[in-house]
């Protein structure tokens, strides 16, 4: 539950930072997801995987060489470093994903209310960012349900109705369901 105890309406971004790393992703992994669309964030470093601002049908994405690439495949740790943030959307009523390491026959599954969490942030930091806060020493993939996409202009996003609005004295109830995938 999220409760607005204020005497005024409140507009928020709300998300859950669910991240994965080593050794789970050492050999790469596969994402299975019911998203329909993917678009990559404009405001990311140059050392990235996908072309920014181009919306495609999930799991296809356009890479920096203007080639189609399967975005559901997470490359092995030994492959090229990059930093990326993409947004998956178009889930219908319920969003869900599984991330699976087929070499270890192990995975993780998550489902959520896609009427509230309309986006899945697909964040990847693979030893690319050489300054704060990662210092070239972070390998993480996060699949994060969020109510909206990131914005440098919160006021504009609120005016456009992009953020979740909680009425004064209001409550929003939801749940996420997580499970391990073990044979």
Name each region found by the language model.
Residues 100-148:
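Glycine-rich active-site loops that engage anionic ligands at enzyme catalytic sites
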Residues 131, 161-166:
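Beta-strand-rich interaction surfaces with strong enrichment in secreted/lumenal proteins
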Residues 17, 158-163:
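Short structured motifs
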